[in-house]
Design a protein with these regions (language model features):
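Short, flexible segments with low predicted structural confidence
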Residues: 1, 44-45, 71-75, 137, ...
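Active-site-proximal loop/turn and secondary-structure-junction residues that shape catalytic pockets
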Residues: 2-3, 41-45, 84-88, 117-119, ...
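Short active-site-adjacent helix-start/loop capping segments
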Residues: 4-8, 184
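Active-site acidic/histidine proton-transfer and metal-coordination neighborhood
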Residues: 7-112, 124, 199, 203-208
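Histidine-acidic metal/acid-base catalytic patches
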Residues: 24, 33-35, 93-115, 121-222
Length: 222
């Protein structure tokens, strides 16, 4: 969400605008049969670090307003997954410990935790312990290599991650989130400054995705 949809803003007009923004999205999601949404819904992105963050105040406001948002989402049968972001992209919570503290403070059954191997690689000491720690609170997971290439092309221990997911009985979405080409607003916001695809065509990228999917199934279903 952009700054005008910031649930931790001290400006109540911004918060009300955010709630209206999400309410409209939830109505459309329900019509489309989509039951889950995730990301940095608790704040805004990309963060403006030119100003000193008010972490304590923003956390308090975010928790209070997330309870309101969760009630709205619940009426549409939607689960909200709070993504744990690395320190360069967010500040309210950067690891699983902080993320779980937030989830428990909000205390709504449709508010879950979302982990991402890219962010975990920066902030966590382990790839498996955060998954085991999240347990029943884990609602969504993003997967990708440390340089944001598709799974199988890097050094992340996918077999260990798959074992941890099976250990907690996770049966939710596993979504690949590669960013390998420059250009556009997404490329700018993600800071992709070189072509990581080695000049791949759309067809090449599709084949890479298929290979990564087969690889993950082998790692996660073993």
């Amino acid at each position: 969400p952009r700054a005008e949809h910031n649930l931790c803003s001290p400006d109540t007009a911004v918060v009300e605008n955010a709630l209206a923004f999400y309410s409209d999205i939830f109505r459309k999601m329900e019509i489309a049969g989509i039951r889950s949404i995730g990301g940095g819904l608790y704040a805004y992105w990309p963060v403006d670090y030119s100003r000193e963050p008010d972490k304590a105040g923003d956390l308090e406001r975010s928790i209070k307003n997330m309870r309101r948002l969760a009630d709205i989402a619940e009426r549409h049968g939607i689960t909200l997954n709070m993504e744990v972001l690395n320190r360069f992209e967010g500040y309210l919570f950067n690891d699983t410990n902080e993320g779980l503290a937030y989830i428990r403070a909000v205390d709504k059954p449709n508010v879950k935790l979302m982990l991402d191997t890219f962010h975990m690689n920066i902030e966590e000491d382990s790839f498996t312990e955060p998954i085991l720690q999240a347990g029943k609170y884990l609602g969504h997971i993003h997967v990708g290599e440390p340089n944001r290439k598709p799974p199988r092309e890097g050094r992340i221990p996918w077999g260990e991650i798959g074992k941890a997911l099976r250990q907690i009985g996770y049966d939710g979405p596993v979504v690949m989130e590669p960013f390998v080409t420059m250009g556009g607003q997404v490329g700018k916001d993600i800071r992709v400054w070189r072509d990581l695809s080695q000049g791949a065509t759309e067809e090449d990228l599709d084949r890479d995705a298929e290979k990564s999917l087969a690889f993950l199934k082998g790692m996660f279903e073993a």
